[in-house]
Amino acid sequence: MKQHTYRIDGGFSFEAGGSVSTLQVGYHTSPYEYKKGMKVIWICHALTADSNAEDWWSALVGPGKLFDTDKYFIVCGNMLGSCYGSSGPSSIDPETGKPYYFSFPKVTVRDIVRALDAVREHIGIEHIDLLVGASIGGFQALEWSVMKPELFTRSVYIATTSRISPWVTAFEESQRMALEADQTFRACESLDGGRKGLECARTIALISYRCEDGYIRKQQEADADTLFADRAASYQRYQGKKLADRFDAYSYYY
């Protein structure tokens, strides 16, 4: 897929308050120019993914695959608040020359969808044949379907819902607490701030994504007589570090 950047000049106001003078949206498309009448598939990614769906969804996206980039014009836009090409807390504030950190306006799903829809209009797409979203991408797909139902022929929502439950809210707050417990997080001295908190937050999220049986099947100790079980623990540490190596705590917090 081909990478692009779209700038929204003239100001962008956020649903929960606040605005920025210029908004940037990163996105990927099939590697050719869109022409009217092409079949369009739009993919909304999960929280820590980027807009290159061919990379992280390689089993489904690409030439000759289910979401065939040769047959369909496929678009995936990077969500606002991310650190993968769209404006967010890690972006540079033009007034200070430093990252926004917590001065970046709070982002809602509707804000993300408005930015994606601006990209759609910029490309010149008038109709989307299939809209697909997973996790927070599913929230975006659902919101977009409600805001502009006439745009879509079919929509697919994966691992999502119309509103999060108290159970999910509790998991998310525990992750925020982990970030805030890292003293480097609020210091806002560099985008490496909150790294250890991010590692911990990711391990909390992993437990919500998986189940007890899964850990028993895949993270069982090789030696049942071991004094100190470590396989599942080392897996958690590995996954926490893996995310912190490619993502920043501020974008995760947002």
Enumerate the language-model features and the residues they cover.
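Catalytic-loop region of hydrolases
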Residues: 1-40
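N-terminal cap/lid subdomain of alpha/beta-hydrolase-fold enzymes
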Residues: 28-94
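A gly/proline- and charged-residue-enriched helix-loop-helix capping module
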Residues: 67-71, 83, 108-110, 117, ...
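Short glycine/proline- and acidic residue-enriched helix-loop micro-motifs
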Residues: 97-104, 185-191
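Conserved acidic catalytic loop of the alpha/beta-hydrolase fold
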Residues: 97-103, 110-130
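Conserved hydrolase catalytic core segment
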Residues: 126-169
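Alpha/beta-hydrolase-fold enzymes
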Residues: 151, 157-242
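Hydrophobic, aromatic-rich cap/lid helix
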Residues: 244-254
